[in-house]
Regions:
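Conserved nucleotide-sensing/catalytic segment adjacent to the nucleotide-binding pocket
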Residues: 20, 24-29, 35-77
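Short phosphate-coordinating micro-motif centered on Lys-Gly-acidic
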Residues: 65-140
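Short loop/turn motifs enriched for small/polar and acidic residues
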Residues: 1-3, 33-35, 95-97
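Short, cationic motifs built from Arg/Lys/His that form the positively charged side of catalytic pockets
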Residues: 8, 52, 102-105
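Glycine-rich phosphate-binding P-loop
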Residues: 1-17
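Alpha-helical elements of the RecA-like P-loop NTPase motor core of helicases
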Residues: 9, 57, 82-83
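A broad structural signal for alpha-helix termini and local helix breaks/kinks
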Residues: 19-20, 85
Length: 140
């Protein structure tokens, strides 16, 4: 899956929109974590910026375990400190292309744990830039 730079800025917003959470999804940079309530029994969204955290213990101090069973928890910059937070997680790794003049990003998805054991993520791997599976005729 390939994205443009502006599309990456809206990843968390798109996840929030898909979940139908209350209010705008904005960066948690200065507060570390923002919680967005779910509506009509749907899961909420917990958006964490772990860039300034020094250890997994600091992540645990955010009490994310209180909402893990009823919210999607999106952790930016969580590599190395967030893997053991829940029993299952989906890594979304966003990388720049090798060409410095090319602003596209490549998104790699890898599921871990029982939740993702039988999920085939390969249908998400190749869509034309700026499209969704439904727009290409594929329904996943």
């Amino acid at each position: 899956m390939r994205c443009r730079r502006a599309e990456l800025a809206t990843l968390a917003q798109g996840i929030g929109l898909g979940l139908g959470v209350e209010g705008p999804v904005i960066s948690p940079t200065f507060v570390l974590a923002r919680r967005h309530a779910g509506v009509d029994g749907r899961p909420g969204l917990v958006h964490v910026d772990a860039y300034r955290l020094g250890s997994a213990a600091e992540l645990v101090d955010l009490d994310l375990d209180e909402t893990m069973d009823r919210a999607v928890t999106l952790i930016e910059w969580g590599a190395g400190i967030a893997e053991d937070l829940g029993g299952s997680h989906l890594d979304i790794d966003i990388r720049r292309s090798g060409d410095p003049a090319d602003e596209t990003r490549v998104v790699y998805l890898e599921g871990f744990g029982p939740r993702w054991q039988d999920v085939d993520l390969s249908p998400l791997s190749e869509f034309p830039l700026g499209t969704t599976p439904d727009e290409t005729g594929d329904n996943i």
